[in-house]
Structures are given as C-alpha cells and as structure tokens.
Amino acid sequence: MFSIPLVAPFCAAAFGALVGSFLNVCIHRLPRGMSVNKPRRSFCPACERLIPWYENVPVLSWLFLRGRCSGCGNPIAVRYVIVEIVTSVLFACVTLKLGATNFPLQAAYWLLVSLMIVATFVDLEHLIIPDEVTWGGVGAGLVLSPMIPALHGAPSPLAGLA
C-alpha cells in the first residue's frame, strides 16, 4: 500500500497550498494596514466581492477562473498562485528533508518559511517588511529555540535520558 514517507510530502504540499492562501491574505493586507482576520473571507481586490469557498481553492481556482475575478472579470495577480505553489513546494521539501516523524521541528520550519515568504513578497511589492512579520519572526525564534534545540543544531536536553 502507501507508506508514510511517500504520503507525508504530498500531505505537506496540500497543507502548504492552504497556508499559502492565507499568506496571500497577509501579503495583501499587512502593508495596507488592514486586519488579516477582518473581513474573515477573501475578497476581490478590485470590486471587493466576497469570494465563495469554491472559488478559493488554492492554485486550482486561479487556473479554473483563468486568473480573473468571476464577479468583475478583473485580473487576479499571478502572485497569488505563485505564493501558493512556492509555499506548497517548500512545505513538501521541509517534510522530505526532516521526515514525517519529527513533527515539532517540521512545524517550526513551516512557521519560519511562512514568515520568510510573507516578508519576501511584501518586500518585492512594497519595498517594506511589516513589523508584524519582523517581530513575529523574533518571537517565534525566541519561543521555539529553547523548545526545539534541533533548530540551531543543539542536541535535545532530554537526549541523554533515553
């Protein structure tokens, strides 16, 4: 049948595409001073029409709609699908590199990769990196570093107890 090492990268890629969709929300809203959770649903940047769930499936919806809003017909930037694909690929790569057994380390890298994706794409578009992303990375590093010593190559403090 299927083994976990074969299935895990595909699951990570699918999860990465979903996370990438949320990262697009952050990339669009943070530099504009908008909340990332209000409005809760995604909307067309041109006509502000709320996007129904079936038009918000990562990568597939953009391709199916040919990169256009189904309401007003205005183009939806190719950046949206690029972010979803890049996030998907990077999540799968992290899983391939670390394996499916070390989930805390994997999740920590996913978080750090996500912060870097937001910083990169906001910087490319607006030539800024929002403080929320910078301080989020600092906070994540400070919290995760002692919790997951493998992030910085240190052995686990519990390793000698085994």
What are these model-derived regions, one by one?
Residues 23, 27, 90, 94-98, ...:
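Alpha-helical membrane-inserting segments
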Residues 8, 36, 58, 81, ...:
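P-loop/Walker A nucleotide phosphate-binding surfaces of NTP-dependent enzymes
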Residues 20, 79-85, 129-133:
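Membrane-interface loop-to-helix entry segments
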Residues 12, 101, 105-162:
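Functional transmembrane core segments of multi-pass inner-membrane proteins
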Residues 23-80:
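Membrane-proximal soluble regions of multi-pass membrane proteins
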Residues 29-33, 37, 96-100, 150-153:
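Transmembrane helix-loop junctions in multipass membrane proteins, especially transporters and channels
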Residues 1-5:
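Short, strongly hydrophobic alpha-helical membrane anchors
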Residues 7-32:
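N-terminal signal-anchor transmembrane alpha helix
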